[in-house]
Amino acid sequence: MPVITLPDGSQRHFDHPVSPLDVARDIGPGLAKACIAGRVNGELVDAGDLIESDAQLAIITIKDAEGLEIMRHSCAHLLGHAIKQLWPDTKMAIGPVIDNGFYYDVDIDRTLTQEDLDLLEKRMHELADKDYDVIKKKVSWQEARDTFAARGEDYKVAILDENISHDDRPGLYHHEEYVDMCRGPHVPNMRFCHHFKLQKTSGAYWRGDSKNKMLQRIYGTAWADKKQLNAYLQRLEEAAKRDHRKIGKQLDLYHMQEEAPGMVFWHNDGWTIFRELEAFVRMKLKEYQYQEVKGPFMMDRVLWEKTGHWENYKDAMFTTSSENREYCIKPMNCPGHVQIFNQGLKSYRDLPLRMGEFGSCHRNEPSGSLHGLMRVRGFTQDDAHIFCTEEQVRAEVNECIRMVYDVYGTFGFDKIAVKLSTRPEKRIGTDDMWTRAEEDLAAALTENGIPFEYQPGEGAFYGPKIEFTLHDCLDRAWQCGTVQLDFFLPGRLGASYVGENNDRVVPVMIHRAILGSMERFIGILTEEYAGFYPTWIAPVQVVVMNITDSQSDYVQQLTKKLQDAGIRVKADLRNEKIGFKIREHTLRRVPYMLVCGDKEVESGKVAVRTRRGKDLGSLDVNEVVDKLLKEIRSRSLHQLEE
């Protein structure tokens, strides 16, 4: 009979098989009430699953990450229960858990509206309020198929036919009259599923294949309690206000149009931000001793066959033909950088060789995945590749990490999650080579005092990598930076250097990206700052305004003085009330507004206001210029007097 060992090392002895819920009851009524599931010998199981032999057991509650995920998955089933009651002819496809919630793909003969979602959510609450038990039954494959065939659930039948072995015993979860199929676990009772919200719908092809039928995907979020739900909804509301697509339109930064899906039309102010960002990274390239190069926009398909991209990546590549030759528009810069390395004989004394490029790349992303600047088809990578010896890897990775944190810190990103992905099952190279490479990456992180998580088996087949994920002010994660070792591509493209013993040696290549995509990073910055860019990167840094026509000459003189100092400035001499001008430029998020009236003209001063509404008073013109230049040149995140 089972001896159950709990996480604190204590043991409970039973003379019959017990479930996690039974053990929770044995410990106390509070834990029994909170029990959602169990982890038996490391494996998640339903609260009612029987344990027949000695086992390690952890009781899972809503406070655990696994408990929250289980509850969210059960909310997807609750959605299925509700939609089948409201529209019985609906056919259910798949309903997984996603970050912060769940979705369900459904085949329904109506286009779901917001009113439908409200009705559906209301029915879900009515069902959850009944606090009914969820009954799990393990059945044969044939019984599961017969159950769903009788209910007209064609997609469930297809899943059984195509994805589940006939020897398996699928789990059927009964929500009163509604039945769903899942590996589980799920909540034992619907009392755990009360704090949810249906959010939106979108189209989704069955199996993700555009040849299949388009289904409707219903998204929802679910949380452990009302407070967490409301906090999340408030974050979403704030995120909507910060949406870079909305701000981009308000500030006239860029636009996109159907004739060029996923390609950015940069307007003057947006392109100013782009160029400032590029200039900053270019300065860092010089500081960290990189060459800056520029590779061709497209290259012959033969080269991409050599690299393996044609075999593994061709669906994501744009191609064109000329004079009976097929060309690929580059999706990445690395093959071009190897070609530059290959020009001329290289010695070990020439290494490390650091090569950076603002490379214009294109990838044929699915049209449904395109999202403003965050997911595009045409983008600019701040890409770099370092060619070095095996002995130089650790020092070079160390410098890459320093550069990554140097750049991110300038923009105020200090919450950075770091993951080290190690050798996958299918890989090239020897175990010794991989061990040394992984140790070099880990040591470089440790030497820089950076905590990190291992991602076992998640490295590329050609080398381990470090990933840097930024967390913004809304705690959203953005994976931007990468340091990737590559033992494969240089050799495949014939790269070598003359070693100390006059032998030919293939260099190690380090792929290094910091911003990732310039376009995406501008999108991230726009949402992080809500369009209130630090002065150094703001498209217009200062607007000088007159109150009446009598100050026009003074405004123009002051504007020229600021321009000559290298400050991006505009004069606003329109015949409008000063309050109107201030409101307009405040909405445009211009960092500083300089107001000139007769008093300022007489004193040779200027009244200074910030976009946050702070009145800095009347200041000497030279003092204003000096302070602005100091703020801009230091790339300060804060304005004067903040």
Swiss-Prot record:
The keyword tRNA-binding applies. One of its GO terms (cellular component) is cytosol. It catalyses: tRNA(Thr) + L-threonine + ATP = L-threonyl-tRNA(Thr) + AMP + diphosphate + H(+). Catalyzes the attachment of threonine to tRNA(Thr) in a two-step reaction: L-threonine is first activated by ATP to form Thr-AMP and then transferred to the acceptor end of tRNA(Thr). Also edits incorrectly charged L-seryl-tRNA(Thr). Its cofactor is Zn(2+). It comes from Serratia proteamaculans (strain 568). The keyword RNA-binding applies. PANTHER family: THREONINE--TRNA LIGASE, CHLOROPLASTIC_MITOCHONDRIAL 2, THREONINE-TRNA LIGASE. It is found in: Cytoplasm. GO terms for molecular function: ATP binding; metal ion binding; threonine-tRNA ligase activity; tRNA binding. One of its GO terms (biological process) is threonyl-tRNA aminoacylation. Residues 1-61 form the TGS domain. Belongs to the class-II aminoacyl-tRNA synthetase family. Binds 1 zinc ion per subunit. Homodimer. Zn(2+) binds at residues 334, 385, 511. This is Threonine--tRNA ligase. Keywords: Aminoacyl-tRNA synthetase, ATP-binding, Cytoplasm, Ligase, Metal-binding, Nucleotide-binding, Protein biosynthesis, RNA-binding, tRNA-binding, Zinc. It holds the Pfam family tRNA-synt_2b. Residues 243-534 are annotated as: Catalytic. Its EC number is 6.1.1.3. It comes from the Bacteria. The gene is thrS. InterPro entries: aa-tRNA-synt_IIb, aa-tRNA-synth_II, aa-tRNA-synth_II/BPL/LPL, Anticodon-bd, Anticodon-bd_dom_sf, Beta-grasp_dom_sf, TGS, TGS-like. It is an enzyme of class 6 (ligase).
